[in-house]
Structures are given as structure tokens and as C-alpha cells.
Amino acid sequence: MQAVIPKIQFFINAILSGGQVGAVSMSSNYVIKGVLKNINGPLETIIEYGPGNGIMTKALLKLLSPQGKLIVIESNPKFVKILQKIKDSRIHIIEGKIQDVITSEKMCYIKEAGLVVSSIPFSFLKTVEREQVIEKTYALLACQAFFT
């Protein structure tokens, strides 16, 4: 039963978000393994766009070095509260829409991310916002880094 509760909670948050959440179910272990299969850790900096309830976030923490940082950007306040329950000093939560955060001073200190994982629905963004997010993300990536 405990495994079902996060799935129901995610579904309810997605439905009540007014179109701000791009998925109605959490990422499965199969999806997480597929996304991360070619990523070798430990990494110093990882950025996650749209972490939702943190299912991928927890997997990303395993790829992070002990001194590393995982920056997660989430626009849904209910998901932010869930993310805040993850007890790991390496996680830094930024609440806001990626198209606003990516151009703000909150991102100025980030240099050379080894990995950027996006779970946001780019189709929800305006063309100019989508291009801006991709351009700014590319500028954040270290040499030989991944954006998935």
C-alpha cells in the first residue's frame, strides 16, 4: 500500500496543477534506468528540471560526489514540499518555472554541470522560451556532459 500512495499523490497533483505538470504518472524504474544507463558518476553538479515528487532525484543523488550539488527546479508548490522532505545536504531546491529561473541570478553560480535531466514538457513552452531554455542549458554544460 505504501508504494501506491506516492503514485496516487503524484496523479492528484498532476490533475490539479492546471496543466503545469506534464505527466500524470511518476517515472518508472525502467525509465530511470534507461535515462541514466550511460551516465558514469560521481559527478560534481547535476541539474534537474521538473523533478516532480523526486523519484528521479533520488537516483541522481546516487550519481553525485559527496561534495557535489544537485540543483532541482520545480514550479509546483506541492511537489516542492515533497522534495523538501529529501534529507540530503547536496540537494538545492529552486521553486519556479524553468523559463524564468534559467535566466535569473539563481543560475549565475552554476558552472559546468556534468548532467542536466529534464522532465518538463517542452511542448508547453512558447517557441522563444523553449529556445532560450535549450541555449542557456547548453551554456551550463561541462565538456562531454549530457542533457537528457
Model-derived features: positions:
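Glycine-rich SAM-binding Motif I of class I
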Residues: G54-K58
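Conserved SAM/SAH-binding beta-strand->alpha-helix loop
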Residues: N76
